[in-house]
Amino acid sequence: MTEKFGADLIVDSLINHKVDYVFGIPGAKIDRVFDTLEDKGPQLIVARHEQNAAFMAQGIGRITGEPGVVIATSGPGASNLATGLVTATAEGDPVLALAGQVKRADLLKRAHQSMDNAALFKPITKYSVEVQDGNTLSEIIANAYRHAKSGMPGASFISIPQDVVDSQVHVKAIKPLTDPQLGSSSVADINYLAQAIKNAVLPVLLLGNGASSAKVTASIRQLLEQVQLPVVETFQGAGIVSRELEEVTFFGRVGLFRNQPGDMLLKKSDLVIAIGYDPIEYEARNWNAEISARVIVIDVEPAEIDTYFQPERELIGDIANTLDLLLPAINGYQLPEGSREYLQVLRDKMDGDVKFDRSQTETGRLHPLDIVEVLQENTTDDMTVTVDVGTHYIWMARYFKSYEPRHLLFSNGMQTLGVALPWAISAALVRPNTKIISVSGDGGFLFSAQELETAVRLQLPIIHLIWNDGHYNMVEFQEEMKYGRSSGVDFGPVDFVKYAESFGAKGFRATSPAELTQLLQKALKENGPVIIDVPVDYKDSSTLGETILPDEFY
């Protein structure tokens, strides 16, 4: 009988869970797992930093709903995962992280790379354990995988001592059991909501990240086709409302901004139906400051209650099944005429929006709306657009339209710099037949820019736009609004065209809207990664900043 080691059990468990990709960087405490992956799969994607490998795993989780997998070695290899895992947990993305550890005999010693891995990750994951017996590896992986994707998804972490990885094992890898299937909410609760909608003057759907799965999106769209209720999306709920439904149901996104049509609608509504809503995206104190909103929740688990979020009823169960049963109970409902008139006024406000004088844009630089418009005109609904954090994120969240769920990706819980390129790599792997667009500032790009080598190595069809202004502008304009000056936000220039070329990617620079259009269309015909450096004029950031909620400055 062939000897089997802990590493075999780990890899067999990943195979049984139908994991396609593993992201990571090897090291002595975990290298037997990497050696085993070479023979058995899943496909190993070697990253250039563990944090970015965790972002890539998060991207898989965000897009597919199944945990992305990341593996790192002990010590700093493990600790470098922290930012990626806290981002995944905060933003509801399933991730399974494995990290090497010193041998069990050294766990309590001041030994090389020894630290309490499981304790480090416990506050920022849903499940954090350390394996002490190689024969339990598969059952622990099975439980970690299940924790990562159940309820509100997030990260699971497993610390594996080197001698556990190298130990002989005598059990087979567990094959995953059928996922528990939630039923709908109770019939009584569904009928309660149906009657509440019929009695309401202006019921509104608030759609969050938890409503963005393909199954739930399909149920929401089916409901909206029959009962045209007004809808507001959070940033991570972008794309739930289809292009066909936009004109009659969609009233914008909420997050960061005050006094936008979506905010006005939520305050005016006498019934807010929060579906898959997570307050980390847009805290209820921002849209329910008066503590007067009547709220009913549809979700997979009970809501977190606070002063500003006190739902009178919670419909807990499978969201799609609940919506499918709600539809026949409210079919035929129409908003009162007065509400329809109000919504038309609100739509006119959306069309008017904040006005900017683009004629004063600095020569050789583009106004943010020029960039957004060129992107909008040259992307299709099936393209994935990943967005980093920075001033560009504010403009993209407000003005860029998306019509498919989980195709416009934001970090809206942690607002983590550096996610765009790693997420683009994930998207390119799981959506191989489309171009991927990623967007960052010149500050955020260099948090993960080394992964351009990963994209080139894999020849992924990624077009990355860098909004280049030479500052951490999202901080800069907020400081200027607070203190009348800025500090700690300036840095030196980088030639991003040469930077791209040094990695083997194509590099371009666009200094006008026409040139950006030409270069973007050229980039769309390339096979591998392309960087487009776009000098941007952020003179209107302060104008846009005046519409940001004061307590949302970060």
Model region roles, listed by residue range:
Residues G208-S212, Q360, G441-G443:
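Conserved short loop/turn motifs at secondary-structure junctions
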Residues E281-A284, S292, L326-G332, S339-V354, ...:
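Hydrophobic, well-ordered secondary-structure segments
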Residues K4, G134, V187, E362-L369, ...:
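Short, solvent-exposed loop/helix junctions and linker helices
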Residues M1-P336, F356, V374, N378-D381, ...:
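N-terminal alpha/beta PP-like core and its mobile active-site loop of ThDP/TPP-dependent enzymes
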Residues I10-V11, A28, V33-E38, R347-P422, ...:
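Active-site diphosphate/adenylate-binding microenvironment
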Residues G24-G27, M115, G390, D490, ...:
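Alpha-helix N-cap/helix-start motif at coil-to-helix transitions, marked by capping-box chemistry
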Residues L107-Q113, R243-E244, D306-Y308, E314-I316, ...:
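Thiamine diphosphate
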Residues N135, I291-Y393, P513-K522, E526-Y554:
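Phosphate/pyrophosphate-binding active-site segments
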